[in-house]
From Swiss-Prot:
The keyword Translocase applies. Catalyzes the decarboxylation of oxaloacetate coupled to Na(+) translocation. The chain crosses the membrane at residues 13-33. NCBIfam families: oadG_fam, PRK02919.1. One of its GO terms (biological process) is sodium ion export across plasma membrane. It catalyses: oxaloacetate + 2 Na(+)(in) + H(+) = pyruvate + 2 Na(+)(out) + CO2. It is found in: Cell membrane. The gene is oadG2. This is Oxaloacetate decarboxylase gamma chain 2. It is a single-pass membrane protein. Heterotrimer of an alpha, a beta and a gamma subunit. It comes from Salmonella typhimurium (strain LT2 / SGSC1412 / ATCC 700720). Keywords: Cell membrane, Ion transport, Membrane, Sodium, Sodium transport, Translocase, Transmembrane, Transmembrane helix, Transport. InterPro entries: Na_pump_deCOase (IPR005899), OadG (IPR023424). The keyword Transport applies.
Amino acid sequence: MTNAALLLGEGFTLMFLGMGFVLAFLFLLIFAIRGMSAAVNRFFPEPAPAPKAAPAAAAPVVDDFTRLKPVIAAAIHHHHRLNA
């Protein structure tokens, strides 16, 4: 085996070992973050939402078409009057 092939083999070995250690560290980091999140949620849960107060008697809801019907009629009348 030549010196270049030996160096190439050692380079691949070192590369795969480095990638393996990084992958193992990332998995460890993921599990640590999940564990800390579970611990925080267990000891400090989010408060229950406060019940909403009943709304006061509101004015009756009028849809947009009912409010705009006289405006549309006036616009049509004005258009017919100008173009007649």
